[in-house]
Amino acid sequence: MEQIRVEKTASRGIVVEKVYMYLEPDLTPATGTIADDQVQAEIEKFAAAKNAVVEELGQLAEKNEIFAAHLEIANDFMLQDGVESKIKDSKSNVEQAISNTIDEFAMIFASMDDEYMKERAADVRDIGKRMMAVVKGVKLPDLGVLTEPVVVMAKDMYPSDTVKINPALVKGIITEEGGVTSHVSIIAKSLGIPTLVGVKGILSKVDDGEYICMDAGEGVIVVKPDEETEKEYLDKKAAYEQERARLEGLRNTPAVTKDGKRIYLCANVGNVQDIRNALPMNIDGVGLFRSEFLYMQNTHFPTEEEQFVVYKEAAELASQELTIRTLDIGGDKELSYYEFEKEENPFLGWRAIRISLDMKDMFKEQLRAILRASAFGHVRIMFPMIIAMEELKNAKALVKECMKELDERGQAYDKNIEMGMMIETPASVMLADEFAKEADFFSIGTNDLTQYILVVDRGNKKIAKMYDYFNPAVVRAIKQVIEAGHKEGIKVGMCGEMAGDQKAVELLLDLGLDEFSMSAGSIDYVREQILNRE
């Protein structure tokens, strides 16, 4: 018997079940170069593989929005150009050309600091895997063949792997790679499947069909458990399921503290599917819609109409509140179709609202789309990375311009739409009392705020322990912002990781926070803490 401790808990739960090894065929690209007279044939092989993958993704996209982004990537002209140029110029065979181009694309995402964006590298590799399988003429594994309950164990799992997950049969998931913001983690949470990711070397320690015990909440895997350990985990599982049922029973109870304060529980999302996944939690709305993913998963700056379609659907789903953060790129978030100048310190450079105010036509396309969507639900506009009153006023002025343009077109929108801002820099904290007179609401972004206040790169493992939003300097900043907002009568929310941290709930309630916005998987636990608050 061996006990393995794991750091990355993607989805809580306890399982005692046998393992199903979900292993891919060998997709290692063939080596060697090609002759000049083979170039056209290799390009045609790629075209056939691409067309087959695009057709398959198109069918999947009709069932699940996640694959709409895959479809955009598969159709990306830069991907096609990258593969074809390697075949023509480097005389790479088609397998090598696909592999190298996919690696380059994936590295763009993998090098990003933001965990959610870092995980999008897996989406790119998913497309590469599909193309390679077509070229090699091999079949990929299929969870649809399962006939009995198992814990699925894999090197990694991509969105296409998750399509056929049946929660009645897939009782747990363990992967050697991946992070807590990967698609498999997000889908596992939405389906209530216990999941552990980033478990290095696990495939070499377990045999197919072997029973294991798994506590995804505590981050523990027991390999080759004895009878006594199995019974212990079965008892823990029964107790856990009873607790989950109790928490789910609280979902229809509004988050009101025992002293009568109504707290708003919202979800952070990156797309419409995320909203659907969060709705069963009985959320009070969406506290953060990351609009940048519409841009990053595209092959061009999305048009007003393309954005409107998405925002409209989101507004209809999150009818109580949909807070759309305007484009937040720069820093570690790049666009495949727009070349950013190299900067010494991109996190301190041209990013977020600075880009939007410099690229006014692009910004107004987004603002008009948001305004039009506001006719279909309670939509709020939130500006990121504001550090000066001039930025906030200029952004609001552009909204007013867009309103006039929509009036001229005769298109409906909420004439009283709320316009707020992220508080995520020391400057915005120090000027919070002034901003509160101009903004309709605040949302504290503790991820960047903590990084900037403490001068700590949260992606740097050497100083990761210093990244701590419980640091008194950060707590004082949060207190100052909440007090400034309340003095002017505006709502103050939080959409950073701290909002979903159970250890932080009591403190944030003490400070007077009005709205907690977090990943859907944390909402049940935070709700209970709020209800028990004296």
Predicted regions and their residues:
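Non-catalytic, soluble scaffold/interaction modules
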Residues: M1-L317, L322-I329, M359, L367, ...
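Conserved alpha/beta-domain cores
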Residues: R244-E534
